[in-house]
Amino acid sequence: MKNPYDSKKIESYFFMFWKKNNLFKKKLNSNKDNFCIILPPPNITGDLHVGHAFQQSIIDIFIRYNYMKGNNVLLQSGIDHAGISTQSILEKKIYFYENKNRFDYGRKNFIKEIWKWKEESEKKICYQINKLGCFTDLNKIRFTMDKDSCKAVNNVFLKLYKDKLIYKKKKLMHWDVKLRTVISDLEIENREINGKLWYIKYFFSENSNKNSKLNFLEIATTRPETIFGDVAVAVNPLDARYNNLIGKYIKVPLTNRSIPIIQDDYVKMDYGSGCVKITPGHDFNDFSICKNHKLNIINILTISGKICKKPKVYDFNGNSVSDTNIKIPKELQGLSISEARNNIVYKLNRKEYITKFEYKKVVLPFGDRSGDILEPMLTNQWYIKTKKLSEVAIEAVKEKKIKFISKQYENMYFGWMENIKDWCISRQLWWGHRIPIWYDVNKNQYPGISESDVRDNFKINKEEILTQEEDVLDTWFSSAIWSFASLGWPQKSIKFDTFHPTNLIISGFDIIYFWISRMIMLTMYIIKDSFGNPQIPFKNIFITGLIRDKNGIKMSKSKGNVIDPIDIIDGISLEDLIKKRTKEISNIKLIKKIEKITKKEFPNGIQNHGADAVRLSMASISCSNRKINIDIKKIIGYKNFCNKLWNVSKFIIINLKNKKVSFEEKEINLHKIDNWILHKYNKVFKYYKYNIDNFRLDLVVNILYEFIWHQFCDWYIENSKIIFKNNIISRLNNTCYTLFFILENSLKMLHPFIPFITEEIWKNLSKMVRNERKNTTILEFFPKKYLFLKKDNSFNEIECIKNIITCIRKLKFEKKTKFNKLVDVCFINNSYEEKIIILNNIEIIKNIAFVKNVDFSRSIPKNVLKKDIKIINNIKIYIYN
């Protein structure tokens, strides 16, 4: 073994070694258990980030662990087309580089550009998965829009449509005016911003309140720009101020249109004046009131967020209504929302319709992709009825067919599923799965995989024009069937028959609603077992927290705190890191901010740490916390561990070389310190297996780190140095055997976590022993417990000696004596048994603690201060030069 440890060289060699030797393509054995994980498909939107490295490290650990146990194993990789994200990013790119938008390209050419970009992006993603060491055959990688996935998506849609679980209806939804598509409630980010509350006079219609001195009502609103969509003014039925006004009419400002005054419990008497304008086309609460009171709905906005020329009017069921009375002043038509607001406020002020305004904090929905304010909009969308599907999915978790890890996330799942709404599955995008519905000129719907399929099934001749639905499916639709679609369904597939349901899915808690719940619902509805019962998609759900930076802040490009795992693995200069973080950012202020943050955190760039250190650090933080802070210092600590493992392995291999060592356990005459370390090993092996089987990788890392560094290296290796240095013949064979046994089995336990370095060490170690050793760790049988421990007091004896040595080291530190300086030690007032233990292990104490002479005394000498004495297990110790 060469010095020093070179992670780059080792990692590049072994991934090619696994690939060349077809280790990803293990033959199936029907006598073995099956273990499968579907890799959560990363979006094709760009480079993988630390969050991906976190999940993929965890996944690969379980895959390698089960491979070494002899199970049939599959890690099915894939990539998600990420409809809205991909389209949004590519639109920004073509605008940034070409000053064009997608309409300049047209749908067909724009989609071609995305496919080109997808090919480049896929190469990068595969490279990153390889670099991390994931044990998967990337020649078999799937894509959520490949031909087989399209077949699966169409099959599922048509099955749900046939079973009347899919329908199309006009509903009020969040609309992204920038992306020009409907957005799910789960894809919004509510932000508090500074706003205003205007108090506007709404005058009574002629003869509506002629017997009263009151000629107007004061209406408080944060959205004066939507007054042309008003259909009523509402007051609380308990508000005595307005009881006599119910049923009267009032005029919409700047128009001659009259609207009724109604009463509704929703209105808060202490909000503003206690009178609220009802604008159901642009407010969700108003939409509910409209339904209850059977009012019309007016839409005053275009899909691009401009004030329209001619408002669209619908009844409370969403049917079109002709109403020529509803008009918008010409000078407002075509204005943006903010322009219209300013213009309308100006007009109202001129007419003295605004009595006052207040500054007010308002919470508004923003699109998490576009970053723009979303508008409530009445649109015609496709939905899945989820109530029936959710009931079966809830029972699967309640009956423990599916287990959440940790259990706390079950409540989150139940809370969502028990109050689930129908799922809006259509998006007004170009990139995605086109909905497999065709229309004739009369807007009749025809479901089918293709136009020819529709014509054949419904006997429609070629002269009749058929047009496919323009909308695409929500990205989460194809993701929801990924557990079975990625394994080859709907075709007959050995892969599907062998590995479905899968064993484990790994997901962040933030997509339990988006992904996990929907996978369970659709899988259990579509896939049935041989008895016709619903089949679950996976048996265990490992929920992780979200990776944040070391300060607990969410990582984002605009914050300048995103870390590419490849940069941690290979290293990157400060200059290149700044270039990478500011690429495609045109805002000068933001660029300077990112530069400042980067220089402060990484003044010398990022050093290379290697994939193994990254994997080990990711496993060490794989707990159930919702927020997981990642700090490079932690990764440095695990790189140091890899260095330690390398150096101790080198020491063992050098000292075992050319020595005739017996590897037959029955021929080994264990010394008490051999017995002690093997006892420690057995305990570690037990805890390792228990915790990895219970998904506690963080505890496994702690156990292995503590054992290898602080027990094996700090104590047993130090003792073995004495044996080799002094050539103690009687101890050589059992010491060599013990060193080999511990290193061999530690490498096996470590391999799922740090596969590259363990392979290199194994390659060197296996040259020294019997031919049945494989040339790769992963093909070896899983570690075993040591079965020939001596049943005596040797373990406790060595623990006592360890404590004594620790005391001597502490005394040296307190006296500012160098750790390797020889000192004399005095033990005071010991029992006969304690004295025997010390004398029996005097050489260990002398060599490890750097002790020259050992004395025993019945009392503390007068010249020794109490502070200079340490007491351990009733043994008093002091040192002197």
UniProtKB/Swiss-Prot annotation:
EC assignment: the record states 6.1.1.9
Catalyses which reaction(s): tRNA(Val) + L-valine + ATP = L-valyl-tRNA(Val) + AMP + diphosphate
Indicate which residues form the motif 'KMSKS' region: 554-558
The keyword Aminoacyl-tRNA synthetase appears for this protein: yes
Q: Name one GO cellular component term.
A: cytosol
Report which superkingdom the organism of origin falls in: Bacteria
Keywords, A to Z, come to: Aminoacyl-tRNA synthetase, ATP-binding, Cytoplasm, Ligase, Nucleotide-binding, Protein biosynthesis
Domain writeup? ValRS has two distinct active sites: one for aminoacylation and one for editing. The misactivated threonine is translocated from the active site to the editing site.
Q: Which residues are listed for ATP binding in this entry?
A: 557
Known role: Catalyzes the attachment of valine to tRNA(Val). As ValRS can inadvertently accommodate and process structurally similar amino acids such as threonine, to avoid such errors, it has a 'posttransfer' editing activity that hydrolyzes mischarged Thr-tRNA(Val) in a tRNA-dependent manner.
Span of the signal peptide: none
CDD domains, per the entry? Anticodon_Ia_Val
Its source organism is Wigglesworthia glossinidia brevipalpis
Q: What is this protein called?
A: Valine--tRNA ligase
Residue ranges for motif 'HIGH' region?
42-52
Subunit comment? Monomer.
Q: Name one Pfam family in it.
A: Anticodon_1
Q: Name one GO molecular function term.
A: valine-tRNA ligase activity
Query: Where is this protein localized, as stated in its record?
Result: Cytoplasm
The UniProt family comment states: Belongs to the class-I aminoacyl-tRNA synthetase family. ValS type 1 subfamily.
Q: Its gene? A: valS
PROSITE patterns, sorted: AA_TRNA_LIGASE_I
